[in-house]
Amino acid sequence: MNAVRREQRYSSAMKAARYWHLRDDGLIECDLCPRHCRIADGKYGICRVRQRQGDKLIAASYGLICGLAVDPIEKKPLYHFLPGSSVLSFGTVGCNLTCTFCQNFHLSRANRIEGTRTTPEEIAEAAIAHTCASVAFTYNEPIVFLEFAVNTAKVCHERGLKSVAVTNGWMEPEPRKEFYAHMDAANVDLKAFTNQFYQELCGATLQPVLDTLVYIRHETNVHLEVTTLLIPGRNDSPAEIDAMTKWAVSNLGPDVPWHFSAYRPTLQWSEAPPTPLESLLQAKSIAEHNGLRRVHLGNVRIAS
């Protein structure tokens, strides 16, 4: 990963958040994702970046970015969108899921809101300076910094750049509509195909993610690719892969690109071993047998 600029730390910028309402009991309810956090004054939602201040909800991480880098677009992974081009990638901190196996735990569950204070214009200028064709909202969940992502995407479009989201897809319909109105491509993590997995390992539910996939595919012009991180003994059974890929063909079509990626244990969670190559190859075989035409394997080397 090539660093674009040196990170400097600042206290969080404050920006009014959208998608919330004041309840009769005096709590603010966030309407951004299906969790619907109920937030007391001075407290944060579970994402750790949307904070109540008085009778308003604040997007506390607005304009504070982490990990600014130039990547090949294939690293997102997007194999069928502007292939061979470079993308300027960045994230912030925070996430609306609590995945125990998160590969970017230091960002998604960060205890402090910090980063490099940056404007949408500066991001677009950096992308152009590094001959990137697009900008990617990645590393953490972009829906929790929707306001900054949308504003940045608008500026990027004005400068001739595309906007890319790497996302868990767990969002409510109204913010989803606004968010994807400004995206050109998305890679959505479908973490498993059982509600039990989402509840036990992510603190979430499956159906809203499926709804997002169908929405992107059928109600937008956004290019869609899907990634599933295969965790041994958790979501890699042939029966689950069979059900998942049959659903994909029926609801998203046979041409949706699908990436099966290998899990690697982290310091935070090592309850499963690394994904064996055999599991990835088996998933690919099942997916192709069920009709998916663009199946890729990630985070693994295959001997030629």
Give the predicted meaning of each segment:
Residues 1-41, 233-304:
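Auxiliary Fe-S-binding modules of radical SAM enzymes
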Residues 43, 95, 194:
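A generic "binding-loop/recognition-motif" signal
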Residues 83, 116, 202-205, 276, ...:
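Short, conserved glycine- and acidic-residue-centered signature motifs
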Residues 83-93, 97-130:
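Glycine-rich active-site/cofactor-binding loop and its immediate structural neighborhood
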Residues 120-275:
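Conserved AdoMet/S-adenosylmethionine-binding subsite of the radical SAM
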